[in-house]
Every structure is written in C-alpha cells, then in structure tokens.
C-alpha cells in the first residue's frame, strides 16, 4: 500500500470512529486518495458520501447536514482555488458554531513558492475563522507504519475535538490540510480497503469527553421582564413562563411575545438568550441604558452589540416572581400585534412575500423542518406570528448571508429524513434561490431528498431593500436598479435544467400544494410584489 493511500484510509477510518456520518466530496486529482477512501467507506455503509462539483455549494450542503444532525460533517476538496471557495461556508460555520471539517488536499510543502501548478499557501488560509488549522504532514515511505498510524490518528482526533468543541464548548470549523505525494491512486495489487488498525472495538484513538460549560447567573424576576431568544438560544425551562420574543430559529416559546409588541410595553429588564439578529425593535430595547440586560449563551462568547449587558452566564438561577398583571398585559399586546399583522395582510390588495410567509407558517406542523432564507423570509415568518411546537427551524444566521441557502436546505432535508422521516419546507426569496441555483445540481448517483419542497417567493429582486433606508421614495429613481437588482430569471426553466420539478402557483393555491403528498424534491414558485412592501409595513405599524 502506497503512503498516500494508507494515510487517507487511516484518516477516514478515524473520522468515522469520531462520529462523522456524512462527507461531501468535490472531485480533483490531488485529493484522489481521500476520494478512494471515502468511496470505500460509503460502499461499506460506514458513512454517506455526497459528491458535488462546486466547492462553495458543497460547503453549505455540509453545513445543512451538520446543523440538522448536530454532528461534525466533512467537506473534502483538491488544492488551489477549490480551497478558497470554502470561504463563505467557513465564515458562516464560525459564527454559527457549526462543526465543519474542511479536508484540504495539498501538494507536498516543498513545492510552495516554486510555481507548481494549482498550488498556494492554503494551510492557514482561513485565518481567524477556524478553530484550528492542522496539518497532517506528508506521508512517505517509512518502515514503522505503526508509528505513522498513531500520529495520523492522533492528529485526526485533534481535528474532531476542535470541531466539536469537546474541550472548549465552542464548536466550529477546522481546516485539516493533508499534503499528498504521488502515487495518488491505490496500487494495482491493492485489492482491499485495508487500513492500519485503530483502537479495538471501533473506539477513537484519543477519547475526549465533552466539556461541561456551566455558569449559573442569579436573576431576580420581580422587575417586569421580557426574554429575547435569538439564534442558538438553548432551552431554559425556568424562563418559559416569561413573555418571549423568539426568533424563528430559537426554541419554541411557550409564552410568545410578538416583536412589534415591544413598542407597546415598557420592560424593566431583559434576559437575552443566544444571539438576536432580526428585529430593530429588539436592538433598540437591548441598547436602552435604562434597561438591564442579562446575557445567557451556550458557549464562551456572548453578543453585546450596544455594550449594555450587565451580566453573562449560561443559565439563570431565578428568584422572585413575575407580576400577573405584567404577564396578562404582555399576552394581550401579543394577540393585538398578531391580529394587526394578519388583518393588514387580509386587507392588502397585492400578494407580497409576507403573504407567502403566512401561508407557509400555517402549513408546517409538528415533525416538519423549516429552512428559511436569511433575508426577508426569516423576518417575515417571525412577523406573521409563527410559533409552532416541534418544528425544527433552520437558517444561516451566523453571518446571515444569502449564499448557499439551497444547498443548506438540501443538506438539512437529507439529515432530517434520515433521523425522523419527516418533510422539509424551505422558504427563500428569488435572489437567494438564483444565487445558489447550482445547489440544485444533485447527480443521479447521489443521495437526494425525498421530502423537500422549496417555496420561492419571487418578487424579482431584493425586497428587503424596500424596507431599509435605501428604499426611501427619494431614492426611487436609482434604488430599483442598484439595490432591487431585478433579474427576470425564469425559475421554472432554471429548475428544468437541473431536472427538478417546478410549478408556478398563486399564493391562494400554496396551502393546498403544501398539503399534498409529494415524493422527491420540488420547487413551488409564488409571484409576489415588492413595490408595496413599504406601505404594507407602515400600515401594520399604524394598526398597532
């Protein structure tokens, strides 16, 4: 067995022992030893392999798998620009704390700076965005394979520990750079997938128990308190009775408080869970120096955009009790805000993305998974009052980019189907869909979702800018082109190019379409208007 083949087989074997169940592979020559080893493991049923031709979408497919599985997922690629294309996914994984392992095949390090083809200083390329950048070192002919086997397995365990946050409580992306020398394919007489042995019984070479990160924080609940639950909020049963502004990706709120209702009440303190990113009303409250903020997170970092947090911890140790009158008032304004939104939607003469979101919110139920685009859809779902128990909600909120959303949805759907057999509904805008349309390319030999519906709310451009400063009517002569970016893409034709079923329907037909039994992956396109979004949102606020 040649050294590169042995090294790749050992790495793959140890990754499987460490909990990796899915790997995304992009084709290339330099990563051929890894490709052969991964294919052997896939064929043996030890992991599930997904082959993609675009490294950028491959990275987000891996993120979708990792988030839904709550387990590390690898993406493997060749050297050169293939590595650079993982940049967006690595940044998202960093801030969303996703255990993404980037297996970067490299040329022997002595070729750096020589002008060798497809070669650059890729080890450490991701800089501060990864938990670790680890090099396996170059495999060479060596009489003591036992020593090399131990070194390779030990390094792989370090990668897994860093990605899972086993010693830091801070999961995230890791670069695992593996320089490989020719030959890059198995020897002609190497007829089996043999690899040097690991620990007996399939155990990890170096076992590291997960660290317990526990910082109790005493909080008196006597002052009128609201909970703001953002991305990665975690579950806090002793706070469940408090009025909670829960972003869609936060756990189900037993006592919901609509984000627009914050303008109708005067909280005396805030308990912030996770990382809120969506609502300006929330940002305004968190920045109020007269309102103490207690930040509870599941890891070592905590958000504090305004610098107003008074104390931090991981869980609350509570004293005192909320006033019944305060709880009653919050429940009342929550109902009022939800009714104001739904009432204005019913009265509005045009179909907008908010209307599409309302249908989707009402259609998903327990056991479903909902994937949301990072622009208007995730905000719209919150505004229409979505708060359904036992629905897994995913959205790339780490740095909230629109890139890779189709691929994230496919990865999440594959993981959700394997775990529960349930369906996945994705709600995304047209720009988000077009931006990652190559994510629809799933080869005929690759695992494909059997219960994925992608709802594309198509208002032919960037509807979110209608609601921002750039959408002010005084910029109307230029904003449509440089912010709205109309594209006139034929969504149906684009889907047909990738052999994905697509149907254009009216908003009034969407509920029935979502209720249909469907086997496979499909796109439901709903035409929407963005020119009236600003007026619609103004009428909602006026209705409060």
Swiss-Prot record:
Cofactor entry: Mg(2+); Mn(2+); thiamine diphosphate
The pathway noted for it is: Quinol/quinone metabolism; 1,4-dihydroxy-2-naphthoate biosynthesis; 1,4-dihydroxy-2-naphthoate from chorismate: step 2/7; Quinol/quinone metabolism; menaquinone biosynthesis
One GO term in the molecular function aspect is:
manganese ion binding
What broad class of enzyme is this? Answer: transferase
Q: Which key words are in the record?
A: Magnesium, Manganese, Menaquinone biosynthesis, Metal-binding, Thiamine pyrophosphate, Transferase
Q: Which reaction does it catalyse?
A: isochorismate + 2-oxoglutarate + H(+) = 5-enolpyruvoyl-6-hydroxy-2-succinyl-cyclohex-3-ene-1-carboxylate + CO2
Cofactor detail note: Binds 1 thiamine pyrophosphate per subunit.
Its Enzyme Commission number? 2.2.1.9
Spell out the SUPFAM superfamilies in the cross-references: Thiamin diphosphate-binding fold (THDP-binding)
Q: Which GO terms describe its biological process?
A: menaquinone biosynthetic process
Q: Domain of life here?
A: Bacteria
Q: Which family does it belong to?
A: Belongs to the TPP enzyme family. MenD subfamily.
As for what it does, the entry says:
Catalyzes the thiamine diphosphate-dependent decarboxylation of 2-oxoglutarate and the subsequent addition of the resulting succinic semialdehyde-thiamine pyrophosphate anion to isochorismate to yield 2-succinyl-5-enolpyruvyl-6-hydroxy-3-cyclohexene-1-carboxylate (SEPHCHC).
Among PANTHER family, the record links this protein to: 2-SUCCINYL-5-ENOLPYRUVYL-6-HYDROXY-3-CYCLOHEXENE-1-CARBOXYLATE SYNTHASE (PTHR42916), PROTEIN PHYLLO, CHLOROPLASTIC (PTHR42916:SF1)
Q: Which NCBIfam families match?
A: menD
What quaternary structure, including any partners, is listed in this protein's UniProt entry?
Homodimer.
- Please identify the protein, giving its name as recorded: 2-succinyl-5-enolpyruvyl-6-hydroxy-3-cyclohexene-1-carboxylate synthase
Organism per entry? Mycolicibacterium gilvum (strain PYR-GCK)
The lineage, from the top, is: Bacteria, Bacillati, Actinomycetota, Actinomycetes, Mycobacteriales
């Amino acid at each position: 067995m040649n050294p590169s083949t042995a090294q790749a087989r050992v790495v793959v074997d140890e990754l499987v022992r460490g909990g990796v169940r899915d790997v995304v592979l992009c084709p290339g020559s330099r990563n051929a030893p890894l490709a052969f080893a991964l294919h052997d493991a896939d064929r043996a049923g030890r992991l599930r392999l997904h082959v993609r031709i675009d490294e950028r979408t491959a990275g987000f497919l891996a993120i979708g798998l990792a988030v839904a599985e709550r387990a590390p997922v690898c993406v493997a690629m060749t050297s050169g620009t293939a590595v650079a294309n993982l940049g967006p996914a690595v940044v998202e994984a960093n801030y969303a704390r996703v255990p993404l392992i980037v297996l970067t095949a490299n040329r022997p390090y002595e070729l750096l700076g020589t002008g060798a083809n497809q070669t650059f200083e890729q080890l450490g390329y991701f800089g501060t965005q990864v938990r670790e950048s680890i090099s396996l070192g170059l495999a060479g002919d060596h009489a003591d394979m036992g020593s090399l086997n131990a070194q390779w397995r030990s390094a792989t365990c370090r990668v897994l520990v860093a990605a899972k946050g086993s010693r830091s409580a801070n999961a995230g992306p890791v670069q695992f750079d593996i320089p490989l020398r020719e030959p890059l394919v198995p020897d002609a007489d190497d007829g089996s997938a043999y690899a040097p042995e690991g620990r007996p019984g399939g155990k990890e070479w170096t076992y590291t128990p997960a660290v317990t990160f526990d910082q109790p924080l005493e909080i008196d609940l006597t002052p009128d308190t609201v909970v703001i639950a953002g991305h990665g909020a975690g579950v806090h049963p002793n706070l469940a009775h408090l009025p909670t502004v829960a972003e869609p990706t936060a756990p189900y709120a037993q006592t919901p408080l609509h984000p627009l209702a914050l303008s109708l009440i005067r909280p005396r303190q805030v308990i912030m869970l996770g990382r809120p990113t969506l609502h300006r009303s929330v940002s305004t409250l968190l920045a109020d120096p007269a309102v103490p903020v207690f930040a509870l997170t599941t890891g070592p970092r905590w958000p504090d955009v305004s610098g107003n947090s008074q104390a931090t911890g991981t869980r609350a140790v509570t004293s005192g009790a909320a006033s019944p009158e305060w709880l009653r008032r919050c429940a009342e304004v929550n109902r009022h805000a939800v009714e104001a939104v739904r009432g204005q939607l019913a009265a509005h003469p045009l179909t907008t993305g908010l209307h599409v979101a309302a249908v989707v919110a009402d259609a998903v139920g327990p056991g479903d998974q909902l994937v949301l685009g990072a622009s208007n859809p995730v905000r719209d779902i919150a505004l229409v009052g979505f708060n359904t128990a036992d629905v897994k909600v995913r959205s790339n909120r780490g740095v909230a980019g629109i890139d890779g959303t189709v691929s994230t949805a496919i990865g999440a759907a594959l993981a959700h189907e394997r775990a529960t057999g349930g369906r996945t509904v994705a709600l995304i805008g047209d720009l988000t869909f077009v931006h990652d349309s190559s994510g629809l390319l799933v080869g005929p030999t690759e695992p494909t979702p059997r219960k994925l519906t992608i709802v594309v709310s198509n208002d032919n451009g960037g509807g979110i800018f209608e609601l921002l400063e750039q959408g002010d009517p005084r910029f109307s002569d230029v904003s449509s082109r440089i912010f709205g970016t109309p594209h006139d893409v034929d969504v149906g034709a684009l889907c047909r190019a990738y052999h994905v079923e697509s149907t254009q329907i009216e908003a009034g037909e969407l509920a029935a379409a979502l209720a249909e039994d469907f086997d496979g992956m499909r796109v439901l396109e709903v035409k929407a208007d963005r020119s009236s979004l600003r007026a619609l949102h103004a009428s909602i606020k006026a209705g409060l």
